[in-house]
Amino acid sequence: MPAVHSHCEAAAQDLIELVKSLTIPNNKDGATSSDDGFEAQILTAVQALLSVVNPTDRLYAAFHDGKTHYPLGGGSYAFQKDLVGPLLRALAQDEETMKLREASSSSDAPSLETPVPTCPIVIHAGAQPNNSPHLGTLIVFCYVFLIARAVRDRLDAVAPSKSSQNVVVEITFVDTAPVITSVSEVGGITYQRSYREVAGALSTYMGDYQDALRRMSQWSGVPFQTRFQSDLFSHPAVPGILAWVIEHRGRLASQLSPKYNALALRAACPVLGCGLAEKHGRLNEYTAESIAFHCPHHGKHVIRLSEASEVARVEANAPTRNLIRSMSHILDDAKHHVRITGSDYAGTYQEFFLYRPLAEWSRSTRLGSGRTPHILYAPLVVDWSGAKLSKSLYVRDGGYRAMKVLGMDGACSYAKLQAEHGEEGLRRIWAEVESWVSNPHKLFRASYSVEYFRGILEGNAWH
C-alpha cells in the first residue's frame, strides 16, 4: 500500500509541475499550451496519474479533438440527401408487383403513374424487456417514430388526396426471452422459462418502455401500438409458414441454428406452474401437421398447426423468428411493413439467416416473388474499444465503471437517464437522431461512441 501511495504521489507531482509551468510567463524552456510536445506531456501525465489512483481497477483517459467526420461511402453516399423518397418508391413498387401478379390472370393493366404507396404503413421495432431500455434501444425507438413522421409528412406533401394515409409505429416485445434465473440444464439439455411464463417478470421494466414510447409518440404525432410474440404467431399466415419450415427443416436447421443443427422452435410446458421450454429444440419431434415438444418433468406435449390458439404458444430463436416475421410481412398484401433494428444485424447476419432461406422459400413456393423485407439499420452506440453498448446483464461486473465515473449511467438505463437528466435527457437524444433523419448520410455511420453522446447529454453540439 505505501508503494501504491508513493507512485500516486509521484504521478500527481509530475502533473502539478506541468500545470504550474503554465502559470509562469515566458518560462525558460519556452513551452506553451499551444506546443504539441507540451500537450503530449500534459496528456501523458494525466494518464499516468489515472493509472495509479486505483491500480486494481484502472481508468484510462480518452482524449480527442471534438471534431466529427462523415466520410461518404456505401449507404451514406447513396442516401446522402434522401432516404424517405427511395423507401416510399420501394413500397409503391411492391404494390405494382402485386398488381402485375393480379393482372397476369386478367385483362386489366396496372397503373404506372408516379408511384405512391396507398396501403397503410407499419414501422416496426422490437425489444427484449429484460432491462430498462439503454441508449442503443432508445435510439432505435427515436428512429422508428422519426422515420414514421417523415414518411407521413412526405406522403402529405406529394399526395394530398392521400393525407389520411395510415402510418403507425408498432413495438413488439420479445416476452419469450429467458428469465436468467430460470435457465437450467437437465441431462445436457437446456431449459428455460420466459418472461411471459414467470409471474411479474414482464412488468418489472415495462413502465420504462411505455413512458419513453409515450413521449416519442407525443413529440412525433405518430400513434403506436405494442405487440407480443403471441401476436406474431397468431398471424393467419404463420401455420402455413411453419409447415414449410418443418418440411425443409433438414436444410434450415443448419442455416438457422448451426450450433445445434436443430430448428430452435419451442413451446412452454402447459402444465400449470411449470412453463419450462427446451431452449434449442433438440428434442422436438415433427410431423406435417404438428410439433411435439419435451418437458423434463411432464414429458411430451403437442401443438397442432391446424389450431390457431396452439400455434400462438410457439416460440423461436432470433434468426427463426426473424425469418417467420419477414415471411408474414411479405405475404401481407393489405399493409406495408418497414423494420428498424440495430446495425449489428446487418450484413452477414441477414445474408445467412434471412435472405438465403427467403430465396429458397420463394423458389419452392412461388410466394413473395420479387419482394424482400424493408429493413433500416440504426447506428450502434459503442464504448471506447468499439464494442456495442450492451445490457448490463451481458457485461461482467464493473464493465461500465468508467461510464458511472463520468456521469453516463443514463446510457445504460432509461430509469437512470430520467433520474440524472429528467425529460431533457431523452429530448437531447431525440434531437440528435432527428438531425440524422434530416441528414440521412448520418444514419449510415456504423456507430457513435458513448463519449459522443456524453457531449450530447451535456448540451454540447459536436462539429
Where are these regions (language model features)?
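Non-catalytic terminal extensions that flank enzyme cores
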Residues: M1-L135, D153-S164, V168-E170, E247-S328, ...
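Active/ligand-binding-proximal structured segments within catalytic/core domains
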Residues: G136-I147
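Acidic carboxylate-rich catalytic motifs and surrounding loops in phosphoryl-/glycosyl-chemistry enzymes
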Residues: S163-Q165, I171-D175, F224-A237, H374-L380
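Charged, often glycine-rich, active-site loop that binds/positions anionic groups
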Residues: A177-T190, I241, K388-R396
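A charged helix-plus-loop insertion that forms the helical arch/lid used to bind
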Residues: S182-T204
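A broadly conserved sequence feature marking short terminus-proximal activation segments
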Residues: G200-A268
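Active-site rim elements
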Residues: Q229, K335-S343
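P-loop NTPase catalytic cores that bind/hydrolyze ATP
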Residues: D344-R356
